[in-house]
Amino acid sequence: MIVGRKEEIAELEKLYYSDRPEFVAVYGRRRVGKTFLIKQALKDRITFQHTGVSPVDQDSDKSRMKVQLESFYYALLNQGLEGYKQPKSWMEAFFQLEQLLQHLDTGERQVVFIDELPWMDTPRSGFLPAFENFWNGWCSGRDNMMLIVCGSATSWILSNLSRNKGGLYGRLTAEVKLSPFTLRECEEYFEHTQIQMSQYDILQSYMVFGGIPYYISYFQKGLSFEQNVDKILFGSKPRLRDEFNRLFAAIFNNPEDSKKVVRLLATRHAGFTREEISNATGIPLGGGLTNTLAALVESDFVMRYHPYG
């Protein structure tokens, strides 16, 4: 069962039953439930699905491209591809996907779901031009095609899909931004999982975990709010051990700079000016800080505001 997300589910259903090709981007911060939403909303209706490999713990750019291509090829094999060798380029890989989809085509809606798409776009891999060609040269001419892409690296989705000025300009037919649970949705979640929580404890859980479904999914029946928090964040083997470092490494191109900014902002309730951030972190005021702040804002980690007076 999906808690909340009624508008997002209705949007996906509407797009599924449209009579034209659809290119949908679903984005939002990591752990917010994007993959779960898509798989539950379109259960048993996905023709092909693949998830990019996390860049965390990967080495050189060349090695990362090889790993991504390898993983994509195995997904093709697992879902019915026959008679093709492992692709050496993304252009070849998407050609193989086209062949598989043609083989599986019954005339009904075909849903292609590519999760964590930004991870697949490794440096100098030629991924984006090949992906553009896949949509522009093949998918867009098939009325039964529904391509759904998903990613936690919101800045990548916005820069390369929503605001693309090249081959994918204006190609998205829908965008779905998935936000954390509201306070009411947190309450619904605890009711659904039969975890007894007072109104005050639900409010505290929201303040600590920010309405992120993945985090509150670790709450256990029979434990108090304090016991659950201790088990998730502090105990001898906390569930979210090293989450901070792994989260930033998976989302941002410059995780160390992003962490510096977040740590600094956490020290003052009223926030900092760009100049103050630059002076305190050593990140140059030019493109470096601008890009870092833009990525953090777009990923809902920080917010920009203009003080009055």
Give short role names for the model-derived ranges.
Residues 1-309:
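Phosphate-binding site recognition
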